[in-house]
Amino acid sequence: MKLIKICVLKNSIFRDTFYSLFDIIYPRSENSLIFANQLRRILLGKSEGLRFLKISGFIANKNSKFSVYQKINEFSEFEEINESVFQLFLNIKNIDLYYRSCDANKRFFGTLEAYYPKTYSQDDIILSKNIKLIKKNQHIFSLSSLKLKMKFILEAKKGIGSFFTPVKRVNYIIEENKLSFSRVVLELETDKRRGCFSSTIDAFKVLNFFALNM
């Protein structure tokens, strides 16, 4: 494992986003462009996250004497819903979720019930205690009829890749010199699921580097 030095030049938080600027010093034996590209690719494509992937939706007529729920899928169509069911499901899958590392082996669930005409957001989802929402008031769908009521059972799963990663943006500048080391200035943005420093340290581990914070 090779030694790499990292210095935090800037840290800031804006709304739901962490921002950091790092000065990274590493052995000149490493090809600078290959090193920087590998680091960027790992940050954007190999970070772990949590998303709602399994959605079970049910709908019933409120005017009937007995509520009989029928299962719906993403290709169902209802004029009482302003969005397509496909878009509704997609909005749920795009919700950013946070879980603690000590809960990593647990199952993650949520429920959403829609009984009245209104706009429903992710704040209307009832979550199990081991997961939290990152953003507030993220739109899901609008119900415009008193005739229908809907229920959704949501199961969240962990995954690795661009759909799951908390990393939102990665930029870098390579600084060449004639010394025995090279350096990269790394600009990084993540959502509140994971901080910039932790994400960068994890990427170094994949590259088989040991990071020393200066």
Swiss-Prot record:
GO MF annotation list: DNA-directed RNA polymerase activity; protein dimerization activity
Keyword tags: Chloroplast, DNA-directed RNA polymerase, Nucleotidyltransferase, Plastid, Transcription, Transferase
InterPro entries xref list: RBP11-like (IPR036603), RNApol_insert_sf (IPR036643)
E.C. number: 2.7.7.6
Main location: plastid
Subcellular location: Plastid, Chloroplast
Protein name listed in UniProt: DNA-directed RNA polymerase subunit alpha
Source organism (scientific name): Euglena viridis (Cercaria viridis)
Name of the gene this protein is made from: rpoA
